[in-house]
Amino acid sequence: MKLSVIVLVASFGFAVALPSKKREETAAENELTGDQQDAEQHMIYAVAFPEIRTSCVIGWKQQGATCERDCECCGVAATCITGDKSTGFCGYHQTPNVLGQGILYTADTIKNGFSAIFCAG
């Protein structure tokens, strides 16, 4: 009788201890999976929107410089971000959403194309 009670208690102890170790391993795996997903998201963003370093035409302004029109800024999608003022600064519209960033980049590129036509005069 004593032996069966000891076997029962030992079996119960093993049954309780085993899942807790599995939970710790699962938590560690989930943490690694989250880190991996963050790294993959960053890589997707970097591939989808590469930062192209090119020299600018003399007279074009770098990112952060003051401007009045889009055609003054260096970069395909660089725009003159004005807000409520007449003068602004050269920069890029940004959003944390990859799809939204692609849409903004495309819209700014098209807008800069038209802006270049009107600024040429």
Swiss-Prot record:
Expressed by the venom gland. Residues 1-17 form the signal peptide. Disulfide bonds join 56-74, 67-80, 71-119, 73-90. Belongs to the neurotoxin 03 (Tx2) family. 03 subfamily. The keyword Endoplasmic reticulum does not apply. One of its GO terms (molecular function) is ion channel regulator activity. It is found in: Secreted. This is U15-barytoxin-Tl1a. Its main location: secreted. It comes from Trittame loki (Brush-footed trapdoor spider). One of its GO terms (cellular component) is extracellular region. Keywords: Disulfide bond, Ion channel impairing toxin, Knottin, Secreted, Signal, Toxin. Ion channel inhibitor. The presence of a 'disulfide through disulfide knot' structurally defines this protein as a knottin.
